[in-house]
Each structure stands twice: as C-alpha cells, then as structure tokens.
C-alpha cells in the first residue's frame, strides 16, 4: 500500500516505514504529524484518486532529525560591466518516517 501526498508544495510517494526528506518543519524531533493532503492511494488493485484530494485519507508520520544540505554557490556576472556577485545557499530539510496510511 502506498499513497501520493502533497506537502509544502511538493509531492512524495509515502509507504509504511519509508523515510522521506521534506523541507524544514517547525515541529520537534520525535513528534507526530498528520498529513491530510493525500492525492492518491493504491492498495494492490484498488486505486483511489482524489479530486484534488482523497476525502478522509491521511498519512501519519514521525518527525526525525533536521539537517542542512551542502552549500551551493550562486554566481551572477555581467560581461564588460565589472559586475559580479557570489552568494551561497544551504537548504534546510527534515527527515520524516511514515507510520501509517489511513484511507
């Protein structure tokens, strides 16, 4: 059984016991969250597609550790104008573990 969920504007395939890396959450590590924006649920041959969400369906997950990606460098340059800018960015993520899929 798996579900396609939408969380913070991105879509993820959630299966029981799967670990997902999502954008940073403000929830404490070890706390439980419920995600009710379920787009699709597949249980063997039975597939339920939402319009846009499946009513009554939810995914329960446990919040894990938060971490930051390695730094990427953003560089801007204008030819012949003596203009260049360098900026770094590190995206913050949180790991969640899917506990249960109800639907």
UniProtKB/Swiss-Prot annotation:
PANTHER family linked: 50S RIBOSOMAL PROTEIN L21, LARGE RIBOSOMAL SUBUNIT PROTEIN BL21M
Organism of derivation: Treponema denticola (strain ATCC 35405 / DSM 14222 / CIP 103919 / JCM 8153 / KCTC 15104)
Role noted for this protein: This protein binds to 23S rRNA in the presence of protein L20.
Ranges in a coiled coil: none
UniProt gene name: rplU
Keywords from the UniProt entry: Ribonucleoprotein, Ribosomal protein, RNA-binding, rRNA-binding
Lineage of the species this protein comes from: Bacteria, Pseudomonadati, Spirochaetota, Spirochaetia, Spirochaetales
Gene Ontology biological process terms, A to Z: translation
Pfam families, alphabetized: Ribosomal_L21p
Protein name listed in UniProt: Large ribosomal subunit protein bL21
Keyword Nucleotide-binding: no
Entry keyword GTP-binding: no
Disulfide bonds: none
Family: Belongs to the bacterial ribosomal protein bL21 family.
UniProt subunit comment: Part of the 50S ribosomal subunit. Contacts protein L20.
A GO cellular-component term linked to this record: ribonucleoprotein complex
Top-level taxon: Bacteria
UniProt cross-references to SUPFAM superfamilies, sorted A to Z: L21p-like
């Amino acid at each position: 059984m798996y579900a396609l969920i939408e969380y913070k504007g991105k879509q993820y395939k959630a299966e029981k016991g799967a670990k997902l890396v999502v954008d940073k959450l403000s929830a404490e590590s070890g706390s439980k969250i419920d995600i009710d924006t379920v787009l699709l649920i597949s249980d063997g041959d039975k597939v339920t597609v939402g319009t846009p969400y499946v009513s009554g369906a939810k995914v329960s997950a446990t919040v894990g550790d938060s971490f930051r990606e390695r730094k990427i460098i953003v560089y801007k340059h204008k030819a012949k104008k003596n203009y260049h800018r360098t900026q770094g960015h590190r995206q913050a993520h949180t790991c969640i573990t899917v506990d249960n899929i109800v639907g």
